[in-house]
Amino acid sequence: MTRLQLALDEPDLEVAVTRGRELIDLVEIIEVGTPLVIEYGMESVRRIREACPGVEVLADLKVMDVGRLEAALAFRAGADWVSVLGVAADATVRGVLEAASDAGGRVLVDLIGCPDIPMRAAELLRLGANMLCVHTAFDCQEAGVGPLDELSQLLEVTPAERAAVAGGIRPETLPAVAELAPEVVVVGGYLACHSQPREAAAEMRELLTGEQVR
């Protein structure tokens, strides 16, 4: 069954902690978003880990260099997952994977900006990446760009259980994404901006899994 990941991208740690606690029973993974990591460092990972027991925590570091060291910091802070960019060098990806192996953690590779997703995905799978994520950049979403085509490309070479998708996913786009059955669907901005985030998260979960949670 596809899992739902909550991306906490607001750069206010107290707001993020509150949102994580509010939605913890509706998601399987909580992401400590890049803005939080930039603003608060590893303290953001520690706080979300402490506030949200029972779910997996992903530190969205988007590692581009110094892979082993940077990933180790997040794993020591309590992350279950760390993200590395797919455009990073293989040596960097290997470093993140080594840190994950040392810590018993896992690695998500963010394919944002990758010019050839099937080719790079195949390379990353050979390196041992646990999860590959197609990701429509926030700055491109206003132009109507979405991740569906890239998800289809990813699934040409990647087992669904190692595929994730992120970027502007909303109730009206979720059914088409869910039909492709990736392992993880990441939702951030839609829930962050919603006046009733718990109701919105429940709706997304129902659309994704078919289970009634309201």
Segments and roles (model prediction):
Residues 1-68, 76, 117, 122-127, ...:
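Conserved N-terminal beta1-alpha1 strand-loop-helix module at the mouth
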Residues 145, 151-179, 185, 190-191:
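A C-terminal functional module that forms or caps the active site or interfaces directly
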Residues 35-39, 61-63, 88-90, 114-115, ...:
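Short C-terminal domain-edge/linker segments immediately following a structured domain
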Residues 96, 151, 178, 189-214:
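C-terminal helical cap(s) of enzyme catalytic domains, especially alpha/beta-barrels
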Residues 24-27, 52, 100, 158, ...:
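Structural signal for hydrophobic packing residues in well-ordered secondary-structure cores
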Residues 2-8, 30-32, 57-61, 82-84, ...:
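Hydrophobic faces of well-ordered beta-strands that scaffold small-molecule active sites
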Residues 4, 66-160:
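Conserved anion-binding
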